[in-house]
Amino acid sequence: MSNNPHPQDDGSQLYDNFEISPPSIVIRKADTDQSLNKIMLNQESQDINNYYTENVKNDNNPNNSYQDYTFSGNSSNQQHQQQQQQHLYEDLPTQFHYSNNSFFEPPPAPTVELTDDPLPNFNYPPSNIYINDNASDISLNTKDLPQFTTNEFLSPTSQLSTPFSPGHYSQSSQDFLQVNHTNGSGNNNNNNNNNNLLNPRSPSQYSSHSLYSDNSSQPASPFLDAASHVSNNSFIPPVIPTALSDVGSQNLDPSHNLGLSANQHFDSVNEFLSTGEIQLGQSVSSTNLPSMEEDSIKWGGGNGQEAYTSLAMMEQRASADNSGMRLATHQFSETQIKQEDQQTNMNHQYTFSNPQMNFDFDITVTPPPQQLEVKPFGNDKDMNNSSGTTNNNNNNSQFDIVSTAATNNSNQLLTENNLSNYNQLQRTEQGNDNDSLQIHRDATGIIISINQAPEEIAAKTPSLFSNSSANSSIHNSPRSDIDNKSGQYYNNGGDGNSLVPNSQLLPSSPNSNNDNYGGGGSSNDENNLLNPEEFQSVKRGRRKSHASRTSTNPNSLSPRSRSRSRSSAKSSNDAVISDNDESDDVLQSREKMLELALPSSSSKRTQKHPSLYACHLCDKRFTRPYNLKSHIRTHTQEKPFICSKCGKSFARSHDKKRHELLHQGIKNFKCEGYLQDGTRWGCGKSFARADALRRHFQTEAGKQCVKRLLLEEQANSSGKPLATSSGVEIT
């Protein structure tokens, strides 16, 4: 700024305003991206404002020009300033217009041209940084770190570097912990110092670790763990310390060294590792337990020999290797030996003892029972007669084995085929020596004990299929009749729970021989079998027995009984009313519809035929062998009949047939029929089962369907009202 307090003319005042030393900057154009120098921008702001005021004055005077300005004062100084100002005007941008109609804009901010990069260079490291690209040679450089002597620290500093590091120096014997062995004269053995050093790059020769394994050679030692590199055996010869003793104690008995020489080590002797013995200070582990049994069998007693302990065996081996070292073997007293022999002979007990720890480790093995001799079944008398007294002495220790399909495989289910041979499995016979009863077992030695049903309970038990009730007497059973006779039906001893053929219980025909009923089977079995024609005649006779009685005295029976007497085309009355066993094959007829609509009288009927067939596994009895066979399958869970559509299994064939009709969509039972005058009745609904149609007749809609049929039956029965299945009388 100008320091002249007196104002001058316009021309001189303009240059006085620029009386300042020019800054050492270079004016860049507006499109440059250099940083601003804020200090110099603030310094020139006042001069620019003064220049703007003079420029306005010059615009008002059109005769003035920049070339007409005259300078006053020091001509040399003003001339120098004028040249600098002219040079400044030449470098001004084009937006500075000194015309009347131009608007003044300030010049761009001055910038400083940088010659050096102010940011540090990260491309190249400094020379004092050591970098090695070899991954295997990565180490800690300790050249510039303070060094410590081995007297101050146990771990030498040379262990922290590798031979490739710059600060590496050769290892010396003073950098390591030395193990000095004192000989008998008391002098140190300095010749073996190099061999006794703890080498950090390899496992120590006295370490508890192996070179190829992370597991310790003493896996169950209480003083070592799997990650320990400190050896308890770092003594020459190595000493196995006893339990609860100081680790590394040198005041141990030399007899505990197990006969190892000074150049041998516990890890290098594979014989001790394979013996499986429990060392002193160790416990039972998975590494030594499998071989303990082998050593106990090899060295232990059982045949009158003395049982060697694990320590005694190791001492004997050590004494065999070192002749100069005599180890005493622990001897037991005579009483202890006798007791151990008795226990060994009785319980096969193997004892592992440690005399220093005063404890015994016993393992008791219970052997399986000795298998007795097998006597063939069916040849008892022949063997007893031929062998004489030899077999008589062994009769009490032998078992009779019956090889059947039911007992050869314990997982096999009971079936009706092997149930017929069940009496042979429990057959008993008289002994030769003491007349005692011997139980005959199967090959597995397992007896299936099933309590037989008493006769009294079986007689009072109602049948599941044949409507047997308390009216059935014990005398109706063929078992009592057979027992009263000679008892020759059962060839195996007279057990009455076997399936008896139908021909033995009832005569198959009027021409059948009655002598065969109690004789003993002299005739062929084919003659005693029931023929299919005769069986069908028996069924028809049972169905017509009631109809024949109604024909003799029709007035003594109810109208419902007379309607049932005219039923000659039905297949099975019991199947429809009680269990529906044969209802699928029944034709739709007038009598069938009446039976379904009228209430059943099964509770009022008495059993006409005896329950001849009893179940072996429960108290139930049946009048037909088919019903018994189907019932036994409920015990054995046997379902041999399989549906061809869905694979569902059934115990009875007619159940499978009825189920297959559901897949086919066949419904044989319809709610429809014709009256005697030809009028149709019913709603026409179809049902797959007869019991479903009977339930339909019990509904309100079903009562209306069957009402006309019941009215017609009432008219035919001399005007007496009929009671429907719901208990309502038809009037």
From Swiss-Prot:
A zinc finger (C2H2-type) spans 613-635, 641-663, 669-700. This is Transcriptional regulator CRZ1. The keyword Transferase does not apply. It comes from the Eukaryota. PROSITE patterns: ZINC_FINGER_C2H2_1 (PS00028), ZINC_FINGER_C2H2_2 (PS50157). It is found in: Cytoplasm; Nucleus. It comes from Candida albicans (strain SC5314 / ATCC MYA-2876). The keyword Zinc applies. Residues 78-87, 187-217, 384-397, 465-477, 497-516 have a biased composition (Low complexity). Induction: Expression is higher in white cells than opaque cells. Induced during exposure to the weak acid stress of acetic acid, through the regulation by the transcription factor MNL1. It holds the Pfam family zf-C2H2. One of its GO terms (molecular function) is DNA-binding transcription activator activity, RNA polymerase II-specific. InterPro entries: Snail/Krueppel_Znf, Znf_C2H2_sf, Znf_C2H2_type. GO terms for cellular component: cytoplasm; nucleus. Transmembrane segments: none annotated. Keywords: Cytoplasm, DNA-binding, Metal-binding, Nucleus, Phosphoprotein, Repeat, Transcription, Transcription regulation, Zinc, Zinc-finger. Disruption phenotype: Leads to hypersensitivity to ion stress. Probably phosphorylated in a calcineurin-dependent manner. Residues 54-87, 178-225, 364-398, 465-587 are annotated as: Disordered. GO terms for biological process: bipolar cellular bud site selection; calcium-mediated signaling; cellular response to acidic pH; cellular response to calcium ion; cellular response to mechanical stimulus; cellular response to starvation; cellular stress response to acid chemical; filamentous growth. SUPFAM superfamilies: beta-beta-alpha zinc fingers. Residues 54-77 have a biased composition (Polar residues). Transcription factor involved in the regulation of calcium ion homeostasis and required for the maintenance of membrane integrity. Binds to the calcineurin-dependent response element. Plays a role in azole tolerance.
